[in-house]
């Protein structure tokens, strides 16, 4: 394998540029899964666990299973969409690239119906909130993914609420195309400038462990004490000379969690 140079990474940003007529949007939609009889969050193993849920989803909908140490940790279909697993068993739809929000709405609706059809057989249900409203950190179940074990050990070293972020939060994210470096900068700056407004508009997590938390968005509060090396608003984004190279320089100075070699996550 040839040595990777800085310019190779900048070229990767350049390779993502697309003409306006080819622009797409991609949505990531997370939700908590719980047992209907007890409202407890669902663990990976055992009866009506996340493993059984993923395997049934794959069988009934002809999705391909993605395995790690013989455990099903994600699914994907022929369109480019996937269902992945967050640290505490939150399920995430990573939608395929689509042309508009109407298509995204349809995709999400079909996904939720697919989920409900299988969950009803297992006595499970789901809810889309920014923060688990009922259960404590110690009540959560860790999913059997190698990189989460590394992050689990790292998070307490850099913040007080990183494990809560991993186990007790959900979100909806959007991925956008860009046609040039300047277009990327423009979209990046606007999205960061509007982040607080978006948080206020869609705040829906006022409870922690069954009590009012004092926040309309407990999820947003958690991110203030997670890992300052990779959270918050990077001031560099609003620099007059901000672009691919300066963003890359910022990324390269962020401490790494791990590297991935020959199918394994290696703690560094």
Predicted regions and their residues:
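Terminal catalytic/cofactor-binding subdomain
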Residues: 1-159, 168
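Loop-rich catalytic cores of soluble enzymes, especially ATP-dependent carboxylate-amine ligases
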Residues: 131-268
């Amino acid at each position: 394998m040839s040595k990777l140079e800085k310019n190779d990474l900048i070229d990767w940003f350049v390779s993502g540029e697309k003409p306006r007529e080819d622009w797409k949007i991609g949505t990531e939609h997370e939700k908590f899964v719980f047992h209907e009889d007890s409202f407890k969050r669902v663990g990976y193993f055992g009866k009506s666990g996340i493993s059984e849920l993923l395997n049934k989803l794959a069988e009934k909908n002809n999705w391909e299973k993605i395995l790690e140490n013989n455990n099903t940790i994600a699914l994907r279909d022929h369109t480019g969409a996937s269902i992945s697993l967050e640290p505490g068993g939150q399920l995430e739809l990573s939608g395929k690239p689509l042309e508009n929000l109407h298509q995204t709405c349809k995709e999400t609706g079909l996904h939720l119906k697919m989920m409900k059809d299988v969950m009803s057989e297992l006595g499970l249900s789901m809810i889309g909130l920014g923060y688990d409203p009922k259960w404590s950190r110690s009540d959560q179940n860790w999913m059997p993914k190698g990189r989460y074990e590394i992050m689990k050990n790292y998070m307490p070293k850099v913040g007080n609420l990183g494990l809560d972020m991993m186990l007790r939060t959900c979100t909806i994210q959007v991925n956008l195309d860009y046609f040039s470096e300047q277009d990327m900068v423009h979209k990046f700056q606007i999205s960061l400038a509007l982040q607080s407004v978006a948080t206020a508009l869609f705040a829906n997590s006022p409870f922690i462990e069954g009590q009012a938390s004092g926040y309309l968005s407990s999820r947003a509060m958690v991110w203030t004490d997670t890992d300052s090396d990779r959270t918050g608003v990077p001031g560099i984004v609003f620099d007059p000379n901000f672009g691919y190279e300066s963003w890359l320089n910022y990324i390269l100075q962020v401490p790494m969690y791990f590297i991935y070699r020959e199918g394994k996550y290696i703690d560094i």
